[in-house]
Amino acid sequence: MSVLQGVGARAAAIFFACAPACPAIAADAAAGLQKAQVCVACHGPDGVSANPTVPSLAGQPAQFVATQLLMYREGKRKDAQMSPFAANLSNTDLNDLAAYFAAQKLPARAADATTDTQTGARLAREFNCVQCHGATLLGQQHIPRLAGQQREYLKTQLRGFKAQTRFDMDGQMTSAAQPLSEADIDALAAYLAGMR
């Protein structure tokens, strides 16, 4: 089954707007490994980023990876490195890369002893992150994994949603981020990054 199939009601609009004839393409993780070699420079070996501002792709849901690449390819999401890279990806490439990264494991990181995890945990409960991101915040379908993601990257994304400068397919994250203070963003990102 293609990872671009069954993306869900919230993502349907982007597919109708960006790729009206997205064919069903079987995903090939082995082919994805070959195609992912260029990704290693930023996202790290096997999609495990060592750069705190660059997301780890290991263990992300395949539909999420394919959807993000599609949004970069179609100009809905913009980034100086990702937009040119995605511009020439075929639907087969999107699926293969997505299958490869979804199959990788994100290793456990040492917890930051200076982090106030109680505030972050409270905010995650208060904002009901599990409703969309899954019970253990590992992501599902076209919604990303948050657990174990790079702290600085998470902060940047939350700030972008709050400022409405980050593309938000359905407006859920923009709404959720509005009441967050900078201290809340830091605490929430620290908590999520430290999850195993």
Regions found by a protein language model. Give the residues of each.
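Sec/Tat signal peptide C-region and signal peptidase I cleavage site
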Residues: 22-26
